[in-house]
Swiss-Prot record:
This is DNA replication and repair protein RecF. PROSITE patterns: RECF_1, RECF_2. The RecF protein is involved in DNA metabolism; it is required for DNA replication and normal SOS inducibility. RecF binds preferentially to single-stranded, linear DNA. It also seems to bind ATP. Its main location: cytoplasm. Transmembrane segments: none annotated. NCBIfam families: recf. InterPro entries: DNA-binding_RecF, DNA-binding_RecF_CS, P-loop_NTPase, RecF/RecN/SMC_N, RecF_2. It comes from Shigella dysenteriae serotype 1 (strain Sd197).
């Protein structure tokens, strides 16, 4: 699936843009603040219902406007799909697919699997566990049809349980929540464990190509003791959870621990090496999706030249081309991306929110 057409209206500093896109590489070139990251963010938002630079909707809608509008056309092997997203200052969204309203943002995410690589993406490696849980959950979402419903129900139950912890005095009062919570926790943890085991070889092989000087290991931690049933953990920790007023153990505390030569990667790797590792993990995840489902990711890469020397940029470019996926790359200068260009590429110039090809 590739995005063949993109319409942007009143998003960030882009008043309007109507763009025909390449199914291969699309380069966005312009000075800092020109709007090239805004175009990447518009594509991301069309597939996620939210921006990646700000959760405040007022900052995403163009100044003095009431809403942004995004439309796209997706070309698959057998059919074309029209998609649209409108969001106003109150945060109300309207999702349209093939001319009909009432759809969910999750449907857009399923139609447009994408990988985002930005200068801020180091949080996957040196941020908290929630960023690595999101990495695993992206894979589970695209690999298991029941994952999103189970994950949504888990969040709801945890919120209810945490509220109940402020009121109950005996563990028996929590059993109605815990009965369903335990089933969901075990199912989600099983999916995460299976996904992390399945993608492990892809991550190891890709990381070895990008960082051959390190021995990298990946370890999934489910969020409670390995040999203990979750039901036992919840009951045993009731008094502590009640004092904390939240549930201290469970799938919401899971992590994917990544080590280089036995030490945490954030303590071992330089910024450039961390970016290479981040790129390797995103590539491995996209390639695993293609192999398992036949579907290809869309890659968004902001500030391509940042932290990478010529050799590493060349390696990343060659691996991206090998995926045969659609790729959007922003850069300050065309010189940084010209070697990646071919007869199927498109080069867009971005200046003060105006996008031309």
């Amino acid at each position: 699936m590739s995005l063949t057409r993109l319409l942007i209206r009143d998003f960030r500093n882009i008043e309007t843009a109507d763009l025909a896109l390449s199914p291969g590489f699309n380069f966005l070139v312009g000075a800092n603040g020109s709007g090239k990251t805004s175009m990447l963010e518009a594509i991301y938002t069309l597939g996620h219902g939210r921006a990646f630079r700000s959760l405040q909707i007022g900052r995403v809608i163009r100044h003095e406007q009431e809403a942004f509008v995004l439309h796209g056309r997706l070309q698959g092997e057998e059919r074309e799909t029209a998609i649209g997203l409108t969001k106003d200052k109150q945060g109300d969204s309207k999702v349209r697919i093939d001319g009909t309203d009432g759809h969910k943002v999750a449907e857009l995410a399923h139609l447009m699997p994408m990988q985002l690589i930005t200068p801020e993406g180091f949080t996957l490696l040196n941020g908290g566990p929630k960023y690595r849980r999101a990495f695993l959950d992206w894979g589970c979402f695209h690999n298991e049809s029941g994952f999103f419903t189970a994950w949504s129900n888990l969040k709801r139950l945890l919120k209810q349980r945490n509220a109940a912890l402020r009121q109950v005095t005996r563990y028996e009062q929590l059993r109605p929540w815990d009965k369903e919570l335990i089933l969901l926790a075990e199912q989600i943890s099983t999916w995460r464990a299976e996904y992390s085991a399945g993608i492990a070889a892809d991550m190891a092989d890709t990381c070895k190509q990008f960082l051959p000087e390190f021995s990298l290991t990946f370890s999934f931690q489910r969020g409670w003791e390995k040999e203990t049933e979750y039901a036992e953990v919840l009951e045993r920790n009731f008094e502590r959870d009640r004092q904390l007023t939240y549930t201290a153990h469970g799938p919401h505390k899971a992590d994917l621990r990544i080590r280089a030569d036995g030490a945490p990667v954030e303590d071992t790797l330089s910024r450039g090496q961390l970016k290479l590792l981040m790129c390797a993990l995103r590539l491995a995840q996209g390639e695993f999706l293609t192999r398992e489902s036949g579907r290809r990711c869309l890659y968004l890469i902001d500030d391509f030249a940042s932290e990478l020397d010529d050799e590493r940029r060349g390696l990343l470019a060659s691996r991206l081309k090998a995926t045969q996926s659609q790729v959007f790359v922003s850069a300050i200068s065309a010189e940084h991306v010209i070697d990646m260009s071919d007869e199927n590429s498109k080069m867009f110039t971005v200046e003060k929110g105006k996008i031309t090809d």
